[in-house]
Each structure stands twice: as structure tokens, then as C-alpha cells.
Amino acid sequence: VRRRPEAPVIGEIDGSMCGICGELRFDGRSADIAMLERMTGVMTPRGPDSGGVVARGPVGFGHRRLKIIDLTNKAEQPMVDADLGLTIAFNGCIYNYPELREELAGLGYRFFSHGDTEVILKAYHAWGIDCVKRFNGMFAFAIHERDSGRVVLARDRFGIKPLYLAEADGALMFASSLPALVATGKVDVTIDRVALQHYMTFHAVVPAPRTMLNGVRKLPPATVRVIEPDGTQKDTQFWRLDFTRTPADVARSAEEWRDMVLASLRQAVRRRMVADVPVGVLLSGGVDSSVIVGLLAEEGQKGLMTFSIGFEEANGEKGDEFVYSDLIARHYDTDHHKIFIPSTRMLEALPATIEAMSEPMVSYDNVGFFLLSQEVAKHIKVVQSGQGADEIFGGYHWYPPLASSNAPVDDYARHFFDRDNGRLGTHLNPEWHLTRDEARAFVEEHFAMPGADDPVDKALRLDSTVMLVDDPVKRVDNMTMAWGLEARVPFLDYELAELAARIPSEHKLSQGGKGVLKEAARQVIPHEVIDRKKGYFPVPALKYIEGSTLEMVESALTSQKARERGLFDQRYLERLFADPKSAITPLRGSELWQVALLEMWLQTHGL
């Protein structure tokens, strides 16, 4: 069965930015097409250009499509290759697909479309699940083998593309967004107490496979899951970031590393210019996004557009970094768009921002990315963005203290954790508190894994393969996809990340962090942007909660729904309401915003 709602066709693009979903039944019943269409409908913002559902017996796939690469309808999804007996639903972009297509054509494969989706199908047929090792890009996909009934799910190395899973009612369901699974009405939506502890401790990061809901899990990054028709499942992790170094790596000079980083980053930016449409940059004014602009300009990107956002100041804290983004825009003569957001508009946008979150995300810049993406999507469909540079090249303030640490887990927790488990016990109601410190145990286990000996390397590995996946990367995916915009992240090119992991940490920690990247950037961009205090995406009104913002969060946390749920200790909430500015986490976040955001997210999604 194949169903396609009528949708406008805008030329021809491929699997790029989209939403996928599916159902695999294990009880002999056929896939529920109406349910698949419901799930697909929830994800319409992710793929506003077209949509479709394909079902065969117990297996059904759904897809929403934003056209980026192959602008014809031959690339419609779910894609069925009747000759090979394979069906695919794919979300993402494979940057090296032209080379793979050429190689597969040499093996005798014939192609009926021009984009990357069909290349994945042929690659899977040729090389099995090992095909993922050959993909350079961001991806989440499902492939159904007609003859065996087997289904294969896969997610890229850094989890740039999401994939949520739920098992219920004799079936496995999957989707690009958690709300799409909730929309089935079949999943257990009770709160996972371990996930709650992670959220409240590990700076709102809930590592895979957990989510805030007991009935929803997420496929870990760099994982292929093979599901047989009888429901048996097997996971294979196909990539690990390795921080071990050869003697030659240790001996290499800072200048050599600088040149290698610049060459690799240049290649990463070039790869992400693949699309048949113009590319823009989310320009914060920091070194990461600025060097992307510089490299795109050097590569001859025509009509380069840049976008920057700023907010009203609060409590004497500035809300924009336009002085630096203006400098870069002028230097490269970009088509520059500056968006200033007054606090009233920021508040008005919060409900829609929270609705766009697949999981509760506490970072203030979610609303910034949401509003920025809204503006950018009026002009273009693809942007490059600087996420990942701090985690890959060591830009955060908690790395230098680890360099001489004898107790790396303690030192990491002291800088990164929002609260210890003892304090958490006074913030949560007793039935929600766990005596075992799950977040700390998670960090201990991760630090103990082989492949990273130096404490800084252990922290970089944790941050780049866990924290980055479930905070900055997810934030950018959710907020850009809310407006049908595709964000590409060159700093998460896996070859660049592998190179960076080999660089001794002293080269990363120099110059106040990201030293080797800053030296590479000096070859490209004006030094004023490099030799400055590290900035961030400031939204002061959410850090210093007062006035109408305070009214909004107090209303959510004292509502009937919140009282029935009973997550938080009432005395703790009253202290927060009385003096929000007194409760700031080590990472300079508001405790009140953290608890309010969780409650608002639950209510927004009808939970």
C-alpha cells in the first residue's frame, strides 16, 4: 500500500531534512496505516514539501520531506527498490554520496534517481550493515528487506539525526520526534526516574537510550539495530572516537597540527556545500561560525548569507554580540541579516519553542535558534552552523582544571553537574528521588572506558559523544527543523573529529581553549574575532527571571497538572519563586528555569 497526500513540488530534492516513522508488528497483524499517517502528520514541519506512507504486511514506513538535493519526484520517500526488494525511509544527508554512487555503478548497480537516498539502498545491498562505515554525513534511516522481513535501523556517529523508539501493543514503532510516538496513543508516558535524575543533575542531558518517558527510548549514536520478524534485536556500534596517540602524534609540532586541522576543516565545509540550493551560516560572532563563513567565502560560495540574533539586556548583561558578527559580515561582504528580539517577542515564542522540543532542553538559546530559524527559513533551506567546536577542540572552562586532576570524575562533576544527589533529594519529592547517583555512575563508567587515558581526553570524549548529542546537536536539529530548515555542522565531520582526538590536549587548552583551532582560524579570519573573551548565545531574560517571565513559570509550576504530578518539593519551589536569581547552577543556569521548562514541556505535549 502506498499513500501520498497532495503536496506542492518544488523542483527535486532528496532525503535531506525530513521526518521518518514506522511500525513493525510482531503479532501477525498488518501495519496500521492510519496511525502511520498520524505520526507523519505530527512531523510536517520537519518536511513541509511532501509526505508519504508505504506499508507491506506487518511493516510500514512514513516520511515527511524537505527537498534539498534531488529536486525531482523520483527521490520521493519512502523509496521502494522493487529489483533489490528493499524499502527505505531516510532522514539526513550523505555528503560523499557522489563518490559512493560512482563506486556502486562500477559494481553494476543502476540508478533511477539522482540523490543520496537510493545510494544508501544500493550500498546496503552491496555491503550489508557495514555500509554505514562508508557514509560521511548525518543520517537516521530504516530499511525493510522484502524477502527476509528484516528491518535495519541506523543512526549517524554523532546522533545529529534523531531516532526515537517505542515498543507497545505487539509492535515496535520509531520516529524522528518523540511527540510523533506519543501521538500513537500507545506508549507508556510515565516519567523515567533515572532520566529525571540525569535531567536535574547532568545539565538536562538524558543520555541514550533513555528519554524522560518510560515508554520511549532513542537509538544510540553510531549504532545499527537489526530487527528480525520475530522481534529479536541485535545492536552493533560501528564507530568509536579514539583518543590514543602514536609517538608521531605526540612529537608533532603545534604548527603541523594547525595545518592539518585547517585542511580537514576546509574539507568538512566543502563537503557540506553539496546541495542544489544556496547555503547560509548562523553567525554568532564567535570563532567557530566566523571561520565557517571565511572558508565558505574562500571556496567561492556564491550569494553567501549570514544570520545573527540578539536579545534585550537584563540585569546589566548584554544580549547580543553584533559587534563581532558585523565585523565578519563586512569583511566577507555577506548578505547579512540581523534579528533583534525584544523580550515580549521572546516570551511569545516560548510555547512554540517548547512544542518544537522532542525532549526538554534547558539551554536559553533554544528560543534564539527557534526565532533565528524562523527568519532564516524565509530566505534559504540550508545553513552551516558551528556546533561541536567546543567539545571537539576543548573550548569549555571545565577542561583546564582537569589537566592536573587526580580525581577527574569529582572535578568534572563539580564544574558540570547542576547539583549533587544530596541536594537533589531536597529538590524532588521523595517518591521521585533515587538513592543511587545515576548521573555520577554514568560519568564514572564512561571515564573508565578504554581509549582515553588523560582526564581532559576522558571529558572531551564524554562531552562530544554524549553531552553534545543530547544538548547542542539536538537543540539545533529541533529548532531548525521546526521551520523546515536544514542545519549542517562541519565541526562534527567524523574525520575532523578523529583528527582532533589525536591532538595532545595541551594544544587544545592553549590560548584559553581551542588553541589549535584558533591558530588554524588565524590563517582565514580577522584576529579581532579570535582574540576576544569567549561568548555564548545570551538570552538574559531567561537567566534572570522576573516580571512576566516569572509569572509564566510560576503559573506552570503551581498549576493543577503540576500539583498532581508532584515532581518537586513545594518548599524548594517557594524559595525559587521568592528569589530566582539566588539559585544559579555552576554552568550559570537558572534552577527555576530548569524545573519550569520540564513542567512546561510535559504540559505542552499533553503529558
Q: Which sequence ranges carry the predicted segments?
A:
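Basic polycationic patches enriched in arginine
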Residues: 2-4
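Cysteine-centered catalytic environments shared across enzyme families
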Residues: 10-357, 369, 519-523, 528, ...
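Adenosyl-5′-phosphate
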Residues: 11-20, 30, 56-57, 130, ...
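Conserved acidic
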Residues: 253-257, 261, 321, 360, ...
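Short acidic/histidine-rich active-site segments
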Residues: 380-390, 394-396
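A mobile, often basic/glycine-rich helix-loop segment
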Residues: 393-416
